[in-house]
């Protein structure tokens, strides 16, 4: 399905640290092995595998946590992730990451995010726009290169479910301070079995009151009370929605909250047993707003083109239906109106090729 590769695409649920190239992971892990921080032989085969088990996925996440603790590495992986998305014709990317603090190496939440921004600045393989359109001083490196790919990148700061209310509030305030470098929203993610909704609600409400967009990992595990509370909060989007009951679907659909669909991730993590029973089909047939996403393309050995191919095979979508699905994602982005207008132009310019 080469036409899917060339289709303009929008990615709205991508975790920075889960989207690292295998080759980069291998290189960084080898260095850690030489330093005696890890046993390289224990992780080498996991990195090189394409079809990873759930146990191996978690092992990889543990390794990534150890690898992404210095500013230089954060900058490098940010640059590579953006370039990888752009090369498969992703024209707009919302990249999410949890600002990290590591006192031992002098890393604060702010310095971590500054390393991410430096990664955006250092992108050279493609043209990139990562500053909100209202900012008069464009910091992107778009050099009017004819034939060069261009990608719009916006950032979401993630609140980890292990955090306290105070720490969550700190992340929201940092997001507000970094709006001029493309931060457009807040994500709530992390181990869904950890933390209480009431812990994060004050920070999320503060973010909403200050016009930051909100997306929530919702329904990753069975937790009816939390799912209802999250939906009542009326976030701008939710991710996954794997363990919804009928009343949850009813509320979601009545509120028209867009859903970030991560097919491969849901199957690998066994949140959904088979793509044949995935809720993607029901939402699509109900004409509910949804967006196909990768979640962690490195860890789950996928790509956005692959996610579209899965959807096409699963539902038997035509080229024109697939194009319409990809274009509809524009309305769910957290981008400013000027960028949405540019994205519509990009899709409409490509439509004769794909319809």
From Swiss-Prot:
Catalytic activity entry: N(6)-methyl-AMP + H2O + H(+) = IMP + methylamine
Cofactor(s) the protein needs: Zn(2+)
Consequence of changing residue 100 to A: Reduces catalytic efficiency 3-fold
Annotated consequence of substituting residue 296 to A: Abolishes catalytic activity
Residues the record marks as site: Important for catalytic activity: 240
Annotated residues for binding of Zn(2+): 13, 15, 217, 295
Predominant localisation class: cytoplasm
GO terms under biological process: nucleotide metabolic process; RNA catabolic process
Pfam hit, one: A_deaminase
InterPro entries: A_deaminase_dom, Ado/ade_deaminase, Metal_Hydrolase
Record keyword Nuclease present: no
Residues reported in the UniProt entry to bind N(6)-methyl-AMP: 15, 17, 65, 97-100, 160, 190, 220, 295-296
UniProt-listed SUPFAM superfamilies: Metallo-dependent hydrolases
Name listed for the protein in its UniProt record: N6-mAMP deaminase
